[in-house]
Amino acid sequence: MSPSALEERLEQLESRQAFQEVTIEELNQTVIQHEREISRLREHVRLLTDRVRNQQTSLVAPQSEETPPPHY
C-alpha cells in the first residue's frame, strides 16, 4: 500500500471512530433518560397499587358493621 493510501485509510478510520464515539455518547444519554423514566414509572405503579389496595380494603365493611340480611 502506498503511503497516501495508508494515510487516507487512517483518516477514514479516525473519522469512523469519532462518529462512533458521538453515537455511543448519544446512546448512553438515551439509556440514562430511559432508566430515569423507568424509575419514575415504577414509583407511579407502586403508588397506584397502594391506592387500589387501600380502596379495596375500605370498600369491605367489618362484620360488625354489616347490616343483617333480610328475613323472608
From Swiss-Prot:
Gene3D superfamilies, per database record: 1.20.5.300
Region feature Disordered, mapped onto this chain: 52-72
Pfam families to which the protein is assigned, alphabetical: SlyX
InterPro entries xrefs: SlyX
Biased composition regions of type Polar residues, renumbered to the chain: 54-66
Membership in a protein family: Belongs to the SlyX family.
NCBIfam families linked: PRK02793.1 (NF002750)
Name the record gives this protein: Protein SlyX
Phylogenetic placement of the source organism: Bacteria, Pseudomonadati, Pseudomonadota, Gammaproteobacteria, Enterobacterales
Protein encoded by which gene: slyX
